[in-house]
């Protein structure tokens, strides 16, 4: 058992290093100013794109500029304001329910008391709210309080399943709780962001770009796919450059400069 634990921790460190080599190491800003607003934003982020989440939050903030105003809103008013983000009825119910309970229990709109709680207790409190699952709670605890929580979204789940880091039957919550203790201290945020980015840009649900993946050397699923469907040779890029794919690497351009899509 101890060997398996060490193995998982070591694999996560290796994965994190490879991702940082491709994407860099994201800086994590902890937004402690208003965790309740961050909770609202995180609920809005469920099952939608970042762009639609931000549009929904912008419309919500414009129509209900303060938390008391938002808490006093009719469900239908809130649904209309956030409709662009999808699942408006469920999200409006979750937001209004959370605000009402926080106001009743704390006498105001503050979650600052979570800062002094152990991570498991803080997560248990947040997930006791209808509409708030482990992913939503972990995002809030990581980015609002700087706790070592590890959010697993659909992209992170897909990547970690293909890497064999979690069982193929894992849910978002089970994967998060399984991986979290083995992530290196200080790496919960950067690893989450880089895995999620990889899932969006490279390790897509369909037609994953395994030949371009920085994790190909440590990914059983990627190796299987590459063996079954070798990457083709490609030529004639714009500007007269050529790119040749060989064993999962892209080279091309003057002097053999690597040409990798998505590297920033």
Q: Residues of each region from the PLM?
A:
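Catalytic cores of DNA base-excision repair glycosylases
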Residues: 5-228, 238-248
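Generic C-terminal helix-cap and adjacent flexible tail
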Residues: 221-233, 254, 262
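Short, contiguous pre-domain boundary segments
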Residues: 1-3
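Intrinsic disorder/low-complexity segments
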Residues: 235-263
